[in-house]
């Protein structure tokens, strides 16, 4: 007992030292916004156009162009009534001297062609090699920072750590649900804003296309909901399939059965010792037998952990897309996006680590598996940079499908752990507070984004 107390005090001292190191690193990291020179954050982060429209150096030129041509555009929709007046008005502006004798629709199309071309040919303020360096460096930073925190947190699946693990699991479920409902689904529902285009042509188009836009918006929202349900059903199907392939010996397949087999081998050991009066030879087979029941539930429990890794991989992929697209728009915007995603990922990765520990992974294995999900972020960053001229980087189904996976993991794999055993009132209050803290962090991050 005295040795355990001494070990606990020693580990506590090491924890304080590591926390001091993290505070210093955090102070250096959060000084980065000073480099952003007052740049705001884009309201949406998954498309390159969003970040380009946010560039203040390009905005004044685009605004001048829109206001200069406003009357010209407005006149085109009335050419059926006063064609001559509109034609002369366009000639007075001097935009299309060569188009004086041409069809009126030709001039209108030519105008829009120049408008679109100007937007697609907007260039970033850095060369591509520097953009690649900054984007990959930011992605590695986002992957490494949570890893340092995971190294500090003293956590395993032992009985002594069980109350602390349950609190972290509650925090993880709150983070997953908050991430799905407050971050992923809203971004999928409103992927980008058409503010500038709507400002130019609002007087002309809204009266004619309100019904069509309403129909389009309704079908889009329904498709988002279907993809969320598809994510939930897909994760359920994968877990069912894995259980069937494992031979059906996992009747209590979740971690409900993980602590319970431990007393069984103990009874076998004691009975073997009582039956064997002479030596240690009968005890060795008993030890070998006692390891087999422990391995079975561990394999069953790991299903939820690997499902969570798959969802986290897809989520990190979208974060990589955001980083690559933001650095294409400008270095300052890339730094702001990196800090935002880092604040989002730190609590998320801590929750994922707790889920892996509860799933039966060792501490070292859980940390290595968390690093594997960083490959998703690197792949997303590379895809955004390689498709630099391609507009939106992410498929429309990725975000809602990932949200469905997060909802499934939180409600099926994590929350049942909190109801597994009757806990004291104080422990239950801690778990509820941790869950609300996870949701609150996602609210703050969603507001900041």
From Swiss-Prot:
It is a multi-pass membrane protein. One of its GO terms (biological process) is zinc ion transmembrane transport. GO terms for molecular function: enzyme regulator activity; zinc ion transmembrane transporter activity. Its main location: membrane. Pfam families: Zip. Residues 63-80, 249-268 have a biased composition (Basic residues). Keywords: Glycoprotein, Membrane, Transmembrane, Transmembrane helix, Transport. The chain crosses the membrane at residues 19-39, 135-155, 167-187, 222-242, 371-391, 395-415. Residues 81-91, 100-121, 193-218, 269-283 have a biased composition (Basic and acidic residues). It is found in: Membrane. GO terms for cellular component: axon; endoplasmic reticulum; endoplasmic reticulum membrane; neuronal cell body; perinuclear endoplasmic reticulum; synapse; synaptic vesicle. Disulfide bonds: none annotated. Glycans are attached at residue 316. Residues 57-121, 188-218, 247-299 are annotated as: Disordered. Belongs to the ZIP transporter (TC 2.A.5) family. KE4/Catsup subfamily. Negatively regulates tyrosine hydroxylase activity. This is Protein catecholamines up. It comes from Drosophila melanogaster.
